[in-house]
Amino acid sequence: MENEVLRQLEARKSVRVFTDEPVTAEERRASVHAAFMAPTAGNQQLYTILDITDPALRGRMADLCDHQPMIAAAPLCLVFLADCRRWLEAYRMAGAAPRDPGDGDLLLAAADA
């Protein structure tokens, strides 16, 4: 059976060595847009994306993330954070009385991120 999605999943690879070629603004926007199009729990998108451009901060992150120098060398560094504040914003936007996120909501946010 030929299935394009399965073929793409099987052809996927991790890249940890990068060229010096910068990521264009359009490529950056397309990457973030693709992330926002991914399904999330209840379509709540309980995450925030940080675009880390400061070389010193990338170097610090590389150290803190189990000494992975590819983080500092990558031409694009997006950090996905579980963000339960978005849960509260959704309540406010719906005009509903918010409740504090519980343990399960934190797990949903972590899975979304």
How would you label these PLM feature ranges?
Residues M1-A113:
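Acidic, surface-exposed loops and disordered segments
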